[in-house]
Amino acid sequence: MSVRRVVILGSTGSIGMQALEVVAANPDRFQVVGLTAGSSAGQLAEQAERFGVRETALGAGDSERLVRSVDADVVLNGITGSVGLGPTLAALESGRTLALANKESLIVGGELVKRAAAPGQLIPVDSEHSALAQALRSGAAGEVSRLVLTASGGPFRGRSRESLRQVTPAEALAHPTWDMGLVVTTNSSTLVNKGLEVIEAHLLFGVPYDRIEVTVHPQSVVHSMVEFVDGSTIAQASPPDMRLPISLGLGWPDRVPGTGLPLDWTRAHTWTFEPLDGEAFPAVALAKCVGVAGGTYPAVFNAANEQAVAAFHAGAIGYLDIVDTVERVVDAHEPQAELTREGLAEAEGWARSAADRMLGR
């Protein structure tokens, strides 16, 4: 393959830094031509100097302008939160291949993003959706029976709802598998993140919500599965390492040799799968309802959750109040008739204000 010119959005975050590792290890495949960050100007400057990058930007607005102006083959969106929607649309509208780690932009943007994307232009970087994309190569679209997303279960797997009432912010940040930021790690503990991933899977692959399931897999080795109509199940398995889906996102449809360590089949392995406890973790069922409703509901779901997570880490509310607040805000929402960027921003603003009012902030 020829050298691909890459723009990395959110280069100072976890995904962005691992993407730079992939690029550094494969100079014959990738060249960084643009870097952006939210606020870490010093770190961004260091990265630009290291990789010889002239085009940099701070903030989502400048990131969007950079995406439209820089001549690139692939844009990796590693921004956290719905502020990534503008850069996502900019990449798609500019004809770049979009390696998407910023799930919120797809979930919030919904049909706006789908309409902007040409076939094969949007490549998922989330480990679960990268796994699904790989497994879906094994059959035709009409042969797919179900998508099965795996979840580690987070740090509170096996606990009852009542026992979660006293969870502290520090406990919520102790993820058993992945090293992520504050919001994503908290979302993984509440399983809001898995709920968002269900919506993302529907939008990416067009499979109805009643054929998308979640199973708990504590070892986090099987990243997702596709069940076909003949009863076959195709799974993608690898040791947990985000560099693998990142490299696939940058190189798709080609694989990048030597990106991750293979499983060691000379030793015994135990992989377990168990049903999700919907009573203790209602976020997945709520997210499915939100996804079915569509429109501005996913934007409201995501924004209300961000406000509730911030309140939890500020010590203003309890752990169970996070998802309870999101549900109350979603129930109070009156959707807009037409989906536009302006309408989405308005719905998000309403959701944040509504969440704050309900939380007494």
Swiss-Prot record:
Q: Which InterPro entries match?
A: DXP_reductoisomerase (IPR003821), DXP_reductoisomerase_C (IPR013644), DXP_reductoisomerase_N (IPR013512), DXPR_C (IPR026877), DXPR_C_sf (IPR036169), NAD(P)-bd_dom_sf (IPR036291)
Q: Write down the chemical reaction(s) this protein catalyses.
A: 2-C-methyl-D-erythritol 4-phosphate + NADP(+) = 1-deoxy-D-xylulose 5-phosphate + NADPH + H(+)
Query: What's the Enzyme Commission number for this chain?
Result: 1.1.1.267
Binding residues annotated for 1-deoxy-D-xylulose 5-phosphate, in chain numbering: 103, 127-128, 152, 175, 188, 193-194, 197
Q: Which cofactor does it need?
A: Mg(2+); Mn(2+)
Residues holding NADPH:
12-15, 38, 102, 104, 181
Q: Which residues bind Mn(2+)?
A: 126, 128, 197
Give the family, as the similarity comment puts it: Belongs to the DXR family.
User: What name does the UniProt record give this protein?
Assistant: 1-deoxy-D-xylulose 5-phosphate reductoisomerase
Q: What species does this protein belong to?
A: Leifsonia xyli subsp. xyli (strain CTCB07)
